[in-house]
Amino acid sequence: MIVGLSNPKKEYHSTRHNVGSWYLYSLAESYLRNFKNEKKFFGFTTSLNIESNYIRLLIPNIFMNINGQSVFKMASFYNINLSEILIVHDDLELQPGISKLKYSYGHNGHNGLRDIVNTFNKNINFYRFRIGIGRPINRDQIASFVLSNPTKKEKILIQKSILHAIEKNVLSNILKF
């Protein structure tokens, strides 16, 4: 299962905080798949077959700080453990254009990840695909920064890193689980 973290509502679609959903939309498009609204999972879903692996995709359609409900509902329904889920999210510690795959426990201060960890109530490692968005100079500006659109240059760099990850099939590194 792959989850692209985001906030709902049209006003947030182009924000830095929604790059997780940017990745999933691009991934689904590369496999000619469309998302459908699944109310029972509080999100948009589709599925792919990658290297003979059937993979479910989820973009929660609820706010970032409560998206654990959506992830937990779908994971429980399909009997998927947190350790078998790849969470795709924005990362303040990486510059735009940089993305990294990580397998670890924790949320590093990311509210979406925090809610997922708290909802599953488990201290276990899980896969994260971190997409760099950069960081504002002032710590007090983090909320407004992640909820704002990237500059044109940053958006190009972010989109290139997403397309590069899809073309290089970074998922093949974790499909063994």
UniProtKB/Swiss-Prot annotation:
Belongs to the PTH family. Keywords: Cytoplasm, Hydrolase, RNA-binding, tRNA-binding. It is found in: Cytoplasm. GO terms for molecular function: peptidyl-tRNA hydrolase activity; tRNA binding. Its EC number is 3.1.1.29. It comes from Buchnera aphidicola subsp. Acyrthosiphon pisum (strain APS). The keyword Metal-binding does not apply. The record marks N7 as: Discriminates between blocked and unblocked aminoacyl-tRNA. GO terms for cellular component: cytoplasm. Hydrolyzes ribosome-free peptidyl-tRNAs (with 1 or more amino acids incorporated), which drop off the ribosome during protein synthesis, or as a result of ribosome stalling. The keyword tRNA-binding applies. This is Peptidyl-tRNA hydrolase. It catalyses: an N-acyl-L-alpha-aminoacyl-tRNA + H2O = an N-acyl-L-amino acid + a tRNA + H(+). SUPFAM superfamilies: Peptidyl-tRNA hydrolase-like. The active site is at H17. PANTHER family: PEPTIDYL-TRNA HYDROLASE (PTHR17224:SF1). InterPro entries: Pept_tRNA_hydro, Pept_tRNA_hydro_CS, Pept_tRNA_hydro_sf. Monomer. TRNA binds at Y12, F63, N65, N111. GO terms for biological process: protein quality control for misfolded or incompletely synthesized proteins; rescue of stalled ribosome. It is an enzyme of class 3 (hydrolase). The record marks D90 as: Stabilizes the basic form of H active site to accept a proton.
